[in-house]
Regions:
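Residue-level preference for the first positions of well-ordered beta-strands
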Residues: 37-41, 123-125
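Glycine-rich P-loop/Walker A and Walker A-like loops and their local beta1-loop-alpha1 context
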Residues: 17-26, 40-57
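Structural motif
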Residues: 42-47, 127-129, 203
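ATP-dependent small-molecule kinase phosphotransfer cores
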Residues: 2-21, 63-122
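ATP-dependent NMP and nucleoside kinases share a basic, alpha-helical "lid"
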Residues: 116-159
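Glycine-rich phosphate/diphosphate-binding loops that line cofactor/substrate pockets in enzymes
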Residues: 26-38
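Small-molecule kinase domains that catalyze NTP-dependent phosphoryl transfer to phosphate-bearing small molecules
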Residues: 2-3, 130-132, 156-219
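Conserved small/polar residues in nucleotide/adenosyl-binding loops
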Residues: 236-243
Length: 247
């Protein structure tokens, strides 16, 4: 076990100039990519630290208008009512949801916001989960987050999408994520996969990493054509001695 690699990685060659680290480099690349165009879309996976990322983007880009995509969805109470059959009364077990993100979108609100964006002058920042439903804009950035990091944030008080369940049992939050929220988020990500211009890794607070969409797609294709494994996850709270699940 002493030779076990706890941090496996695969080196992807040919894209040294397609990777960016830190907000300074990322801001520079976004502005270069935007050029004289005006609509920046930052579509996000669920659980992103909006207070950090959105504030930085507003400060760096100084947009004339900021559109939050959460406004196209039904309110939190209605979302819960719509999800209830899949959530069940069980603490852990739910029913898998096979629908899409559009099932939870208020189409009237979406149409209104789409019209608003279309008629605005100056830089427009469209931000949040499902932002590309409003428009793919002139530059599409996808801000991603791993499920493991989301679960850690649930434990630290992160609520589910459009909810205020900050102090709820993390297992109940996980259930909502696993059986419904992550399912629609994954489908949505796949739908816009080929359209992503820049891919943003937000797993480490205030230490973002970004690569171009071309580098992102080619890297995934390369990895999928060879053996690979993920970083092992350790659940130290399960028993007195550390138990590692090598996923």
């Amino acid at each position: 076990m002493s030779n076990y690699d706890n941090s496996p990685y695969i080196k992807i060659n040919g894209y040294d100039n397609d990777a960016y680290s830190g907000y300074a480099q990322i801001d520079k690349k976004i502005k270069e990519s935007l050029g004289n165009k005006k609509i920046v879309v930052v579509d996000c996976y669920l659980g992103i630290n909006d207070r950090e990322l959105l504030n930085v983007l507003i400060k760096k880009l100084t947009p004339a208008h900021v559109i939050l995509s959460e406004d196209i969805f039904y309110d939190g109470k209605k979302l819960t009512e719509m999800m209830q059959v899949n959530l069940t009364e069980d603490r852990v077990r739910g029913v898998m949801y096979y629908g899409t993100i559009r099932d939870y979108v208020d189409e009237a609100k979406l149409a209104k916001i789409q019209k608003f964006v279309k008629n605005k002058e100056g830089i427009v920042l469209v931000y949040g989960f499902g932002a590309s439903l409003i428009t793919k804009g002139d530059l599409l950035i996808y801000a991603d987050l791993t499920r493991w990091e989301i679960q850690l944030r649930y434990r630290a008080g992160l609520p589910n999408f459009k909810q205020s369940n900050y102090d709820e049992d993390p297992l109940i939050k996980n259930k909502r994520g696993y059986f419904i929220e992550w399912r629609i988020a994954d489908k949505h990500k796949r739908e816009i996969f080929e359209d992503i211009d820049l891919y943003l890794d937000t797993n480490c607070s205030n230490k973002p990493k970004m690569i171009t969409g071309i580098a992102f797609r080619n890297a995934l294709r390369s990895v999928c054509n060879q053996p690979f494994r993920l970083v092992p996850v350790s659940y130290t709270h399960l028993r007195a001695h550390e138990t590692s699940l090598h996923l």
